């Protein structure tokens, strides 16, 4: 019999329901989590044993949205969900980051978390619901896991923090921050902000962590009622004798290797040491496992680097804890791009370009709650050559999507509004060298490339990655971390912003016990680093260029009456298509009558504007127009005037004498002058050829002598 176990609790303005025991009973654990009609079904399956020879922890997290959740059909030919969208990939990473550090060291059994959105309320984002579900399912499963975690979204409205704001509230909020953590520690922060101060950001993190305790309490209550027995798992026994032998052979040599400041040379030396140690030990005892020796060597490396930092000695590359690597900033490095920059910080380098386009270049994004368009795109590419390796080149991986989104968050707050700058903007960051903090190099490069392209951003932005080494109460915060310091440290803390405030904050913490004091030190140290980088960037380019590139499309904006929109578009789009072909421009019309004409050639744009003005001009009675015959009928001819408007020339108005047959005087496509006699209430236009012809008028005029 199905026997569901349910917990309900109030979480801010929402009601959260946790339910287990009803579905997917063959999974290790399964939970249905709902928050005001947004429901996510989360399952966890863990392998009872690790695969032979497994050397890493194979955790996979898959977040998937089903269109039926919103009562919609999937797009595409097959009408079925396909590969994960960018949003699904980002949410998968968001779930993965806070849970990964909570599995014990040495646990190598395969674990898969699948979160499926099965119902969606447009006002409640499913990502927070999915994270709560993953925490609950892992806690119920019995798999070794130091959870549960809580999670909260924090907004900032009217100078007040808002817990789990609705979608509408987020549009007005100056902050969108997601914080996850255990009962005693923050583990992950992901946020974008509109130039908030360090204190405001830290306050949001602390607020979110305090508020999410109710989630942890309710998951613990659910586990007490429905949790499965804890697995009998023990960490592999430590081979103390082998550790001592490895240490004796390698510690001093690794210490010398980590004084080599150049990355490739250091890596080469470390690899030689590791190969020598494995060979020496296996020569003594060929039954020894090379993987076990490599793992011990990795721990010795970690201890060497961390010990030096905590002792106040210089870092791997010789810097002090708060020093930034050497900077080289160049703009306008590519001749035909609309904007470009080369940003180099030590051994990390990004070639960044900015491209301007029209509204039709904007990305159409099909989300669960409907379609939206994105006018600012930022893409991050991390090719294998940037770290001196070979590898597959193809579609972006999860990491590239995540880093691109972080860089975009860093720049978004300073981008101009559509009514100020009606262009779609695409920024691409090509990482050409990498030794730590390439996403923050992308923020700096994006700011420079946008200024070089003439995009009127509100201010320059820069990004910096901070690290942490902590043992007991002793801790050191590191500015501008290297790749090794990221790998061997306890925290990766990325901050982007301008001189006025923070635009993005991302934090991943590998240990418990990160206090408010440590976060405060890190934020303040990051501010100093950010201001230093901005100072160097401003020497290269301090304000956006006064004009856009000659190779970029220029957008000219005019306004027409809304009742004239149909005239410019024409039947089935015939008029606007003809205009586009005739003028060689791109023309876009909005519902309020705003017309945007884009062209790299100023004369073509002027021609398009002139033609649109002709089409939308009011027909004046008594005025003579040049028209073209479009249809011939027995009682006269229809003539197109004023860009698509048609009027009738009655047979009696063709000539000053009796006309028996219209085709004796007019042919299809013939251009003739016509005078407007009348526009009736229904908008029908009556025309005359004979009154438009000066000779006819002179002949018909009475003599002045009479």
From Swiss-Prot:
SUPFAM superfamilies: Eukaryotic type KH-domain (KH-domain type I) (SSF54791), Nucleic acid-binding proteins (SSF50249), Polynucleotide phosphorylase/guanosine pentaphosphate synthase (PNPase/GPSI), domain 3 (SSF46915), Ribonuclease PH domain 2-like (SSF55666), Ribosomal protein S5 domain 2-like (SSF54211). It catalyses: RNA(n+1) + phosphate = RNA(n) + a ribonucleoside 5'-diphosphate. Its EC number is 2.7.7.8. Its cofactor is Mg(2+). SMART domains: KH (SM00322), S1 (SM00316). It is an enzyme of class 2 (transferase). Mg(2+) binds at residues 486, 492. Keywords: Cytoplasm, Magnesium, Metal-binding, Nucleotidyltransferase, RNA-binding, Transferase. GO terms for molecular function: 3'-5'-RNA exonuclease activity; magnesium ion binding; polyribonucleotide nucleotidyltransferase activity; RNA binding. Pfam families: KH_1 (PF00013), PNPase (PF03726), RNase_PH (PF01138), RNase_PH_C (PF03725), S1 (PF00575). GO terms for cellular component: cytosol. Residues 622-690 form the S1 motif domain. The keyword Cytoplasm applies. Involved in mRNA degradation. Catalyzes the phosphorolysis of single-stranded polyribonucleotides processively in the 3'- to 5'-direction. Component of the RNA degradosome, which is a multiprotein complex involved in RNA processing and mRNA degradation. This is Polyribonucleotide nucleotidyltransferase. It comes from Pectobacterium atrosepticum (strain SCRI 1043 / ATCC BAA-672) (Erwinia carotovora subsp. atroseptica). The gene is pnp.
């Amino acid at each position: 019999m199905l026997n569901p176990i349910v917990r309900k609790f109030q979480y801010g303005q929402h009601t959260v329901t946790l339910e287990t025991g009803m579905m997917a009973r063959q999974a290790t654990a399964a939970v249905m989590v709902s928050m005001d009609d947004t429901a996510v079904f989360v399952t966890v399956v863990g392998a009872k044993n690790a695969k032979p020879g497994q050397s890493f922890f194979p955790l996979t997290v898959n977040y998937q949205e089903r269109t039926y959740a919103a009562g919609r059909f999937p797009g595409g030919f097959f009408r079925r969900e396909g590969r994960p969208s960018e949003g699904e990939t980002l949410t998968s990473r968001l779930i993965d980051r806070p849970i990964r550090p909570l599995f014990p060291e040495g646990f190598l059994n395969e674990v898969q978390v699948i979160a499926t959105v099965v119902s969606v309320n447009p006002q409640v984002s499913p990502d927070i619901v999915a994270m709560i579900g993953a925490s609950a399912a892992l806690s119920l499963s019995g798999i070794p896991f130091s959870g549960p975690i809580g999670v909260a979204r924090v907004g900032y409205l009217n100078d007040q923090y808002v817990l789990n704001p609705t979608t509408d509230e987020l549009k007005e909020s100056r902050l969108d921050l997601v914080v996850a953590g255990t009962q005693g520690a923050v583990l992950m922060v992901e946020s974008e902000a509109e130039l908030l101060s360090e204190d405001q950001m830290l306050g949001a993190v602390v607020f979110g962590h305090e508020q999410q305790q109710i989630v942890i309490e309710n998951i613990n209550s659910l586990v007490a009622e429905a949790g499965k027995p804890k697995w009998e798992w023990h960490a592999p026994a430590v081979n103390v004798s082998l550790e001592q032998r490895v240490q004796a052979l390698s510690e001093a040599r690794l210490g010398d290797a980590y004084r080599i400041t150049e990355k490739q040379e250091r890596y080469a030396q470390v690899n030689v040491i590791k190969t020598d140690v494995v060979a020496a030990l296996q020569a003594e005892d060929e039954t020894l496992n090379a993987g076990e020796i490599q793992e011990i060597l990795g721990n010795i490396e970690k201890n060497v680097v961390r010990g030096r930092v905590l002792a106040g000695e210089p870092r791997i590359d010789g810097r002090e804890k708060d020093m930034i690597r050497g900077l080289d900033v160049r703009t306008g490095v590519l001749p035909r791009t609309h904007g470009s920059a080369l940003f180099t910080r030590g051994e990390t380098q990004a070639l960044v370009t900015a491209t301007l386009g029209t509204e039709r270049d904007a990305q159409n994004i099909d989300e669960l709650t409907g379609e939206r368009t994105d006018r600012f795109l930022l893409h991050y590419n991390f090719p294998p050559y940037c770290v001196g390796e070979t590898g597959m080149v193809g579609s972006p991986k999860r990491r590239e999507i995540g880093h691109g989104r972080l860089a975009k968050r860093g720049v978004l707050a300073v981008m101009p509004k559509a009514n100020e700058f009606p262009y779609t903007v695409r920024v691409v960051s090509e990482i050409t060298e990498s030794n730590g903090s390439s996403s923050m190099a992308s923020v700096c490069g994006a700011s420079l490339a946008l200024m070089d392209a003439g995009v009127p951003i509100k201010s320059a932005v820069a990004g910096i990655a901070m690290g942490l080494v902590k043992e007991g109460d002793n801790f050191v915060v590191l500015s501008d971390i290297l790749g090794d310091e990221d790998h061997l440290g306890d925290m990766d803390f990325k901050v982007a912003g301008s001189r006025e405030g923070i635009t993005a904050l991302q934090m991943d913490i590998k240990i418990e016990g990160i206090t408010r004091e440590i976060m405060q030190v890190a934020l303040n140290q990051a501010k100093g680093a950010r201001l230093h980088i901005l100072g160097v960037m401003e020497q290269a380019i301090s304000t956006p260029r006064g004009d856009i590139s000659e190779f970029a499309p220029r957008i000219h904006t005019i306004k027409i009456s809304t009742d004239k929109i149909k005239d410019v578009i024409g039947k089935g789009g015939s008029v606007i298509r003809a205009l586009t072909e005739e003028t060689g421009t791109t023309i876009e019309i909005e519902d309020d009558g705003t017309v945007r004409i884009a062209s790299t050639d100023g004369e073509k744009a002027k021609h398009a504007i002139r033609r649109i003005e002709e089409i939308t001009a009011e027909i004046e009675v008594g005025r003579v127009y040049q028209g073209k015959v479009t249809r011939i009928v027995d009682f006269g001819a229809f003539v197109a005037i004023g860009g698509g408007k048609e009027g009738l020339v009655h047979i009696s108005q063709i000539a000053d004498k009796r006309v028996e047959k219209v085709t004796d005087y007019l042919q299809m496509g013939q251009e003739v002058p016509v005078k407007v006699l009348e526009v009736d209430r229904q908008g029908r236009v009556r025309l005359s050829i004979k009154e438009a012809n000066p000779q006819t008028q002179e002949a018909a005029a009475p003599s002045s002598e009479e």
